Amino acid sequence: MKNNKSVIIWLLSGCFLVFIMVVVGGITRLTNSGLSMTDWHLVTDTFPPLTEAKWEETFEKYKLFPEYQKINIHNDFTLSDYKFIYFWEWFHRFIGRIIGLVFIIPFIYFLIKKKLNTETLRKCAILLGMGAFQGFLGWFMVKSGLIDAPDVSHFRLSLHLTFAFITFAYTLWVALDLIYPEKKQVILPLRNIARITLAIIILQIIYGGFVAGLNAGLIHNHWPLMSDGQFFHESIILEKESWFARFTEGKSGVQFVHRTIAYFVAGLIVFLTFKSKKHTLSLEQKNGLNALLIIVFIQFTLGVLTLLYSVPLWLGVIHQAMAFILLATTTYTLHRFSK
């Protein structure tokens, strides 16, 4: 680990910045700020408008797009309101630029100093490609809300969100490979359960994106049952014609799936912990499992509260941030059962 300390710090710094970016992205979504910047320029958008005249010009450009014409024009939407939503989208993109610099500049330095072995270099090249693709996905998502509908595609939003989580998890995995270079005997049953758990968490993140994109957290604000005391609410059937659409495009169906997967995630983590009692575990493995139990309980509780209180900004942001911590802990635990 000592020989790779600077590389490890670099990778973990990247993880932290991705975490911050996704939290800010959550605020951007929950404050309806994501469509405030109607174009994308790598250099000229680095700073927000610096004069009142430039603000007026940018605001007038925003007025040409569906979100203003179909929604905000009816809400006495002022330049001051616009500056608020512009800030969050600008800040989200600004952090993305910082992440790019934080990755590329040290990467070049490590290349020159030959601090990256062939395997780590290959993994970092993959990370570079993932970062570039994530930037494309961000604009691809925003573009969907600038044409006809004054909202982004929930499919594109979920793709953008989920890929950020995956990029974070892979960056953490690369760092863990350097922190724990030694090999040990793999406990196959526990590793396989941990893999399934990680996959289900990724699926839950996808549906979390669907819920956010469709504003599906604003309906059926009851727990443990949906509205009218129903486990499977009739609106799931009525909203869409096909079963696929009901569970990918219908608000009630998407929320039902998100609710249901939460039970599977919690159950798998409890099952993994129970199965681990039959094996001799390392300290890192025990710590990972104990942390998972605590975090999944907190996240489950946050999810219920977010639903019951109709997604207040602060709860929605904390719920998304805790999903990151749950993913990080699952990734760490899987790594400790895999290497």
UniProtKB/Swiss-Prot annotation:
One of its GO terms (cellular component) is plasma membrane. It is found in: Cell membrane. Heme binds at residues 258, 319. Pathway: Porphyrin-containing compound metabolism; heme A biosynthesis; heme A from heme O: step 1/1. GO terms for biological process: heme A biosynthetic process. The chain crosses the membrane at residues 7-27, 92-112, 126-146, 159-179, 199-219, 254-274, 291-311, 312-332. Its cofactor is heme b. It is an enzyme of class 1 (oxidoreductase). It catalyses: Fe(II)-heme o + 2 A + H2O = Fe(II)-heme a + 2 AH2. Its EC number is 1.17.99.9. Keywords: Cell membrane, Heme biosynthesis, Iron, Membrane, Metal-binding, Oxidoreductase, Transmembrane, Transmembrane helix. Pfam families: COX15-CtaA. It is a multi-pass membrane protein. GO terms for molecular function: metal ion binding; oxidoreductase activity, acting on NAD(P)H, heme protein as acceptor. InterPro entries: COX15/CtaA_fam, HemeA_Synthase_type2. Interacts with CtaB. Catalyzes the conversion of heme O to heme A by two successive hydroxylations of the methyl group at C8. The first hydroxylation forms heme I, the second hydroxylation results in an unstable dihydroxymethyl group, which spontaneously dehydrates, resulting in the formyl group of heme A. PANTHER family: CYTOCHROME C OXIDASE ASSEMBLY PROTEIN COX15 (PTHR23289), CYTOCHROME C OXIDASE ASSEMBLY PROTEIN COX15 HOMOLOG (PTHR23289:SF2). HAMAP family: HemeA_synth_type2. Belongs to the COX15/CtaA family. Type 2 subfamily. This is Heme A synthase. It comes from Flavobacterium psychrophilum (strain ATCC 49511 / DSM 21280 / CIP 103535 / JIP02/86). The lineage of its organism: Bacteria, Pseudomonadati, Bacteroidota, Flavobacteriia, Flavobacteriales.
